[in-house]
Amino acid sequence: MIIGVPKEVKDHESRVGVTPAGVKALVEAGHKVLVETKAGELSAMPDDEYQSAGAEIVGSAYDVWRLADMVVKVKEPVEKEYGHFREGLVLFTYLHLAPVPELTAKLLDKKVVGIAYETIRDKAGTLPLLTPMSEVAGRMSVQVGAAYLEKEKGGRGVLLGGVPGVPPGNVCVIGGGIVGINAAKVAMGMGAKVTIVDLNLNRLRELDDIFNGRVYTLASNSYNVTHAVREADLVIGGVLIPGAAAPKIVTKAMVSKMKKGAVIVDVAIDQGGCIETARPTTHSDPAYVVDGVVHYCVTNMPAAVPNTSTLALTNATFPYVMRLAKMGAKAAIESDSGLRDGVNTYDGVLTCKPVADSQGRPWKAVGDLL
């Protein structure tokens, strides 16, 4: 198989889909790997490392997309990449289709086999390719939030950890999943007072055990969320429904009651955000203010630490890349129910129910199309 690795073009996206180590393994297995020049440069993986591993360095994204049987990326294609789509192409990347109907339409129109990292499941039912970036984004969210709490950046001027004689800041984490637990770890490490809000009482019990009672846990309902965000200096949005648009847990009315200069970091923005006032932003223009509250809603937060993020991501994705290359997409999908869960588009048909529900489109199970 010919595997293509283009340079990411989303704003300040610095990660890369395959590392030199991955290239070496693919080439040794008899595959050909085309890497766009400078694709790994911002992840501290220069062209010469890819060449030494056996990759062919290609001068343009056009040729990578045109020649590859399977394109391996990090982020969902942006509009300027839609023209590269063609029938039968296998696209393996984060897709986050629910809030982007235009991308869904293009993938369907061109009959691309779109396999989304974020909806692949393992035998335990977890999301193994979403987990590493959720870990990174969860940890980063508190670092970023702490920075934006500084007065110079429009925040309240609060130090999350406090100092002797001055109480710490309050951090409210919406969602007790991978993002939430990692955000809580960092916030606690900084000395903040941390509250985690989740709908699942069993998950709240688990979190209480994990943190030995050192975090506050709240059952998610309108009353509790309103109170928690009103008291918070920093709110982290980390709600996930795999493949679907994130529910709006924090409403505009709740935001209007928050402290002036408080900060919201909505990590769920990839799936539309769980804060009603959230809208996607970029690393070039990351923050804005609504009702005196600073909002940071960058859709590719882990790109700010590309070396760590690329290694963490590809550790998880590469076994699937190798399986798809070895078996071909159809056979690999047929043999692995977890990989089937990752197929969002196939032969012009939408195959992910949460995306279909979010966009009001018809869908079919991919197993019925094979």
Describe these PLM feature segments.
Residues 118-159, 269, 274-370:
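Adenosine-phosphate binding glycine-rich loop
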Residues 2, 8, 77-170, 298-300:
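Glycine/serine-rich phosphate-binding loop and adjoining beta1-alpha1 elements at the start
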Residues 69, 75-76, 95-96, 221, ...:
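Short glycine-/small-residue-rich Rossmann-like dinucleotide-binding loops
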Residues 209-291:
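Rossmann-like adenosine-cofactor binding region
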Residues 23, 47, 104, 142, ...:
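Generic hydrophobic/aromatic pocket-lining and core-packing "Φ" positions
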Residues 2-106, 110:
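An N-terminal-biased, well-structured beta-alpha scaffold segment characteristic
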